[in-house]
């Protein structure tokens, strides 16, 4: 009986997984079973951290806006600024407000003064 040559499908799948894990350290980039386990863990972590990154940036923007608004007035805070923005129907998101607060504080002062009028 003649010898049957194996197909290429499994080898192609494993090389694809190895390319994904080529930057991992130690056995995580060499052994097929640990490569697949680490790939699963890596993909789970990236999906979880995508949502976490959104939360972290939103917290950072809120902190920056709050710091700048409290510098100017004693009783004025982030929550009052956002409330006044909604009352005046000014559509500025927190990312833009934080960039304005860092780069040009005078502009944020004028915005808050116009809102309070």
UniProtKB/Swiss-Prot annotation:
Protein name: Large ribosomal subunit protein bL20c
Its job: Binds directly to 23S ribosomal RNA and is necessary for the in vitro assembly process of the 50S ribosomal subunit. It is not involved in the protein synthesizing functions of that subunit.
Source organism: Calycanthus floridus var. glaucus
Pfam families listed in its UniProt record: Ribosomal_L20
Keywords carried by this UniProt record: Chloroplast, Plastid, Ribonucleoprotein, Ribosomal protein, RNA-binding, rRNA-binding
Keyword RNA-binding tagged: yes
Localization terms from the record: Plastid, Chloroplast
HAMAP family in the cross-refs: Ribosomal_bL20 (MF_00382)
GO terms for cellular component: chloroplast; ribonucleoprotein complex; ribosome
Protein's gene: rpl20
Record family assignment: Belongs to the bacterial ribosomal protein bL20 family.
GO MF, one annotated term: structural constituent of ribosome
Gene3D superfamilies: 6.10.160.10, Ribosomal protein L20
Primary location class: plastid
GO biological process: ribosomal large subunit assembly; translation
